Regions:
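Sec-dependent N-terminal signal peptides
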Residues: 4-13
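Sec/Tat signal peptide C-region and signal peptidase I cleavage site
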Residues: 15-19
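Cleaved targeting-peptide boundary
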Residues: 20-25
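Short beta-strand motif characteristic of blades in beta-propeller domains
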Residues: 32-38, 79-85, 135-142
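N-terminal, post-signal-peptide region of Sec/Tat-exported proteins
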Residues: 38-68
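Extended intrinsically disordered, low-complexity coil regions enriched in Ser, Thr, Gly, Ala
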Residues: 47-52, 92-102, 149-158
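Structural signature of eukaryotic scaffold interfaces centered on beta-propeller domains
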Residues: 72-74, 129
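Conserved small/polar residues in nucleotide/adenosyl-binding loops
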Residues: 167-168
Length: 169
């Protein structure tokens, strides 16, 4: 009986650890969800029949903090913005039902806006907020108040950008 209890306790711990690392995001296409590894930034499209595709490979191979990456839904039903809440890097993530040729993760900002140390606990340092313009988000550094405009596009990936709006020292 004691062994059974220990086994059950280990299973609960393993299940809760898994639940914290992976987060499911509903999409407006009810047959599909996105699964985000919040430690590494890997994104998979999961279809309700069990099929899955990798949209975005791991962005942080040595990811050791749960909740580091987050997806933000846009007004375009096929597009999310992925944010590294430690560094401010962000990507446009697009899923599709037309096939893998239409699934991608394109970098919007590949440069770190902050440089955390190994001991830093910077989860949620950076946050994004939607604006009235469907193509634009505001990126906030909650530690110092700096702001950036983040723009995505479904037509031309050359129109992706992240520009500083407010810089405080």
């Amino acid at each position: 009986m004691k062994k059974l209890f220990v086994l059950f306790a280990l299973m609960v711990i393993a299940f809760t650890s898994y639940a914290q690392v992976y987060k499911m995001y509903k999409t407006r296409n009810y047959h599909n969800q996105l699964r985000l590894n919040t430690m590494t930034g890997e994104v998979q499209q999961i279809q309700d029949d069990g099929q899955s595709w990798e949209i975005c490979s791991a962005r942080e191979i040595l990811g050791d903090k749960e909740g580091r990456f987050r997806l933000y839904e846009t007004q375009n039903m096929w597009t999310f913005i992925m944010l590294d809440t430690y560094t401010g890097k962000n990507w446009q993530v697009q899923f599709s039902v037309k096939g893998e040729d239409y699934m991608f993760a394109a970098p919007i900002n590949i440069f770190s806006l902050a440089y955390p140390e190994k001991s830093s606990n910077w989860t949620n340092r950076f946050q994004m907020f939607a604006t009235d313009n469907m193509w634009t988000f505001i990126l906030l550094d909650s530690y110092n108040g700096r702001l950036w405009q983040v723009q995505y596009s479904t037509q031309d990936l050359d129109n992706l950008f992240c520009i500083c709006l407010l810089y405080t020292s």
